């Protein structure tokens, strides 16, 4: 895959077109990436022992790798 974790990318298609962020994770089999601050989704959580309050939790969802363009690569050590 042309994108690696830590690369800075720009979204070129979809509802978040034009936004920039860093790649948090990659799913190679499904060809999808999770970008920080892009494609925010809300999940409703029931109260449980680990999460006593429950409520609405907001996190990043994955987007298809073809919808992002690499701006700068992560510098290797």
Curated annotation (Swiss-Prot):
Domain of life, per lineage: Bacteria
GO CC terms of this entry: ribonucleoprotein complex; ribosome
One GO molecular-function entry: rRNA binding
Gene3D superfamilies given in the database record: 2.30.30.30
InterPro entries: KOW (IPR005824), Rib_uL2_dom2 (IPR014722), Ribosomal_uL24 (IPR003256), Ribosomal_uL24_CS (IPR005825), Ribosomal_uL24_KOW (IPR041988), Translation_prot_SH3-like_sf (IPR008991)
Region (Disordered): 42-61
Biological processes annotated in GO: translation
Keyword list, A-Z: Ribonucleoprotein, Ribosomal protein, RNA-binding, rRNA-binding
Disulfide bonds: none
Ribonucleoprotein as UniProt keyword: yes
Pfam families: KOW, ribosomal_L24
Quaternary structure, from the entry: Part of the 50S ribosomal subunit.
NCBIfam families assigned: rplX_bact
Family affiliation: Belongs to the universal ribosomal protein uL24 family.
Function as written in the Swiss-Prot or TrEMBL entry: One of two assembly initiator proteins, it binds directly to the 5'-end of the 23S rRNA, where it nucleates assembly of the 50S subunit. One of the proteins that surrounds the polypeptide exit tunnel on the outside of the subunit.
Protein name (record): Large ribosomal subunit protein uL24
